[in-house]
Amino acid sequence: MIFDVLSIVSIGLLIGAEFSVSAFINPILSKLEPIAEARATSLFAQNLGRIMPFWYGINLLLMIVEGLIHRHDAGVSWIAVAPILWVITIAFTLLILVPTNNRIAAMNPNDYSDELKQEHAKWDMLHRCRVLTLSLAFVSLLIGIRV
């Protein structure tokens, strides 16, 4: 039971952080002057780019352990879906979103071109897809734990 709570809180916080980037942070940053927007976007990309890989990995491990803990429960199939979706999301992130994030993190604020701004807008749209997939994994885990 305590492990369930730890898993739910950790995964829920990660999804909340990812959602806040898409729903609040990036829309606010887009209203700044171009140099300020570029500087802030670069800082967010650098900081979150350092933290998120570990948080994603830890949450994947939490889901796998949840599957082991609940392996004899009726909801184990639901729990099994969660890490599968999580791994798909990690692969999508590594192959598509991370390279764009690295370019944004490394940019010079004075060189924030329209091309880079369009690339950031594309990243934002793909990030929303990631948040949706993470949310589906989370709901699957919650259903599995509850069943």
PLM region spans:
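Transmembrane helix-loop junctions in multipass membrane proteins, especially transporters and channels
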Residues: 26, 30, 68-75, 98-102, ...
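Internal alpha-helical transmembrane segments of multi-pass membrane proteins, especially GPCRs
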Residues: 46, 53, 80-83, 121-124, ...
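Interfacial segments of alpha-helical transmembrane regions
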Residues: 1-12, 73-87
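Core segments of transmembrane alpha-helices
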Residues: 55-66, 130-139
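Interfacial loop at the N-terminal end of multi-pass membrane proteins
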Residues: 2-6, 11-58, 102-121
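Juxtamembrane boundary at the C-terminal end of a transmembrane helix
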Residues: 141-147
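Mid-bilayer segments of alpha-helical transmembrane spans in multi-pass integral membrane proteins
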Residues: 87-95
